[in-house]
Amino acid sequence: MATVIHSPRDPNTLSNYNNWVSTHITATFDILFEQKKLVGNVVHKLKSITDARSTEIILDTNHVDIGDVKVDGQASHWELLPPLEPYGAALKINLDQGVGLNEMVEVEISVKTTEKCTALQWLTPAQTSNRKHPYMFSQCQAIHARSIFPCQDTPDVKSTIDFNITSPLPVVASGLPVRGIIEKAQPGSKTLYQFHQKLPIPSYLFALASGDISEAAIGPRSVVATSPDKLSECQWELKADTENFIHAIEKIVYPYAWGEYNVLILPPSFPYGGMENPIFTFATPSIISKDRENVDVIAHELAHSWSGNLVTNASWEHFWLNEGWTTYLERRVSLHGEAYRHFSAIIGWKSLADSVEHFGHDHPFTKLVTDLKGKDPDDAFSSIPYEKGFNFLFHLENLLAKDKFDRFIPHYFTKFKGKSLDSYEFKATMLEFFQHDLEASNLLKNVDWDAWFYAPGLPPKPQFDTSLVDVVYELSSKWKSLPDSSFQPRTSDIEGLTANQIVVLLEQILLFERPLTPELSRVLGEVYSLAKSENIEVSNLYFQVGLRAGDDTVYKPTAELLGKIGRMKFVRPLYRNLQKVNRPLAIETFEKNKDFYHPICRAMVEKDLFGKREE
């Protein structure tokens, strides 16, 4: 029987993963803080998926130094092909001959990272919370693993991984710590840390961090890891909810598969809210708000343990299968009740509307299924796959009724466990699952799948339960009536409101066609104590209200906040709004802090402030 070679369905990789699939990776690295480099080697076990028809292995790389390459222990001829931006330079490894279908070859590559590595951020002691030691962490999503080591940098390929990491400081990785071995002391007061990831994962979930890290329990199968000076407050913030979150999602899908669920609270320059690295979620310190109001980030990253990490989008064009499902599961965590789920969805709708407004209503990146051929997936990053994806699943749930949709959820996550899929397989699976239920089958056949997948702009807005926002809407309408009404703001206006309700209030005020006056903006901050809030979700929105109002008393605090946090959710809108009222301050603030930001964040802000400029 002839071997069928399928064309790869991921346009953002240069690898020939349609000929070879990496099944296991052994990554051995020495962390060199002084040189800001990882040095070591990576071994790929690759399975042939043709019958001796491929005599070359092509891997993704981007700005890595390659030493030698061995195939099955023998030195091999290799070359770096000309760079194809933004994807890097493909590494072509020649084989003497092809190998049979399903036979294995072992490729060992010695490698060093360079200063152009986009996956690693190196922090000076001054950039950490206790200012004592340097720190390093990785962020490989979407296509940055290739800047650490040559790999098939696509979510359509999954490998088990062994990590052997030597560092002078504690290490965490996206594998289970190999316990029962004594961490081995190395020359120069370094220690070897070993981790094993027994479940196959895509390259974007390869993760490392090293620094002054301590751990404390937050549940029977969970620890929080962070800087020692922040450990107790992080433990308090997370210990009340983490195990409850795990139980809640297990009831909806099936038991947690990864053994431990741990959370690493990173230094403040981490660019995302969280990154769902298996075993160790990497999370921003902005969730530590001292009121347990922002732990939904943990619910979201935990939900990725099923959607994304076990069942994965086959390419970044179908990113909603990761993020839409995860947002859906996060909101199904019923610790707060159904009204809160709708409340969270209303906040999400506002975020979706903002993203559509930012790109433009007919922009291709506002589609659920995007075309990323020749594009950098980071450029398409926004709330759209999260919130448009959530709203599609929420629409299907309401269409079918929750009890029927709930029967589909574990079926879907079982069928694709350990696999990657695209939107068309999702659709086919749903239609097939309900084919013997005439009512459900007819309802699904009448869904305008093409409009959901390919229409740009906002989807149809669902009927949300507005009970938790009605009180906020009422208060925002009073603010809207100023200065023409007799409304006098008082502290009692917000008594009993959660921080997330304050977020909605501020978002409503940002929607006013006529911004607040500078004087009213100051009253808002003073009477409701918003300017001093330790909850960045609140303070960043208050600053945006002030910037829109032209209230110059928030300009300096905005610039100060931009020097303390690197989460793009806050950084990008604050820069966009600051530059509208004081562009010199925005540019000065960016130039002062650009080395503090993660390379991904820095590149995005540069585009926001300057358009595409050369390095």
From Swiss-Prot:
NCBIfam families: leuko_A4_hydro. One of its GO terms (molecular function) is aminopeptidase activity. A peptide binds at Q139, C140, Q141, P271, Y272, G273, G274, M275, E276. GO terms for biological process: cytoplasm to vacuole targeting by the NVT pathway; lipid metabolic process; peptide catabolic process; protein catabolic process; proteolysis. Aminopeptidase that preferentially cleaves di- and tripeptides. Also has low epoxide hydrolase activity (in vitro). Can hydrolyze the epoxide leukotriene LTA(4) but it forms preferentially 5,6-dihydroxy-7,9,11,14-eicosatetraenoic acid rather than the cytokine leukotriene B(4) as the product compared to the homologous mammalian enzyme (in vitro). It comes from the Eukaryota. The active site is at E301 (proton acceptor), Y386 (proton donor). Its main location: cytoplasm. CDD domains: M1_LTA4H (cd09599). Pfam families: Leuk-A4-hydro_C (PF09127), Peptidase_M1 (PF01433), Peptidase_M1_N (PF17900). Belongs to the peptidase M1 family. This is Leucine aminopeptidase 2. Its cofactor is Zn(2+). Keywords: Cytoplasm, Hydrolase, Metal-binding, Metalloprotease, Nucleus, Protease, Zinc. It is found in: Cytoplasm; Nucleus. It catalyses: an epoxide + H2O = an ethanediol. Signal peptide: none annotated. Binds 1 zinc ion per subunit. SUPFAM superfamilies: ARM repeat (SSF48371), Leukotriene A4 hydrolase N-terminal domain (SSF63737), Metalloproteases ('zincins'), catalytic domain (SSF55486). InterPro entries: Aminopeptidase_N-like_N, Aminopeptidase_N-like_N_sf, ARM-type_fold, LTA4H, LTA4H_cat, M1_LTA-4_hydro/amino_C_sf, M1_LTA4H, Peptidase_M1. Zn(2+) binds at H300, H304, E323. Its EC number is 3.4.11.-, 3.3.2.10. Disulfide bonds: none annotated. GO terms for cellular component: cytosol; fungal-type vacuole lumen; multivesicular body; nucleus; NVT complex.
